[in-house]
UniProtKB/Swiss-Prot annotation:
Highest taxon listed in the record's lineage: Bacteria
CDD domains from the UniProt entry: PoNe_Nuclease (cd20736)
Name the UniProt record assigns to this protein: UPF0102 protein CYA_0708
Species of origin: Synechococcus sp. (strain JA-3-3Ab) (Cyanobacteria bacterium Yellowstone A-Prime)
One Gene Ontology MF term: nucleic acid binding
Amino acid sequence: MPKRTSLQNMGEAGEACVRQYLEEQGWQILAQQWRCRWGELDLVASRAGELIFVEVKTRSGQGWDQKGLLAVGIQKQQRLIRAAQAFLSQHPDLAELACRFDVALVEQRPGKEGVSYALADYLQGAFELWE
């Protein structure tokens, strides 16, 4: 089994931060790091008849890509939509729920006691399904 990279660990820490945020908002996490041939869904959650697919971007600094937002371009959105469709085909009981694609931007912050992770921005309905 390959070694985990610090980027993978940072990504997982960012996902854990967003997972906690969503659970505090009353969302039930249905899947984390769900994979299919089209890619990975970082988080899938439901609440009150609504289903969200959350793409989490974790960055250690300001960077050039607006804290990860620019990394969710058209091609990435298309892969996420296909992955969401694959998820729904495997979970037909969820197919009638209203679906939304959100993007969570997480910052890694250095501190005296090590690094911490904080939700920098949460974009509800960051993009939509197009025909």
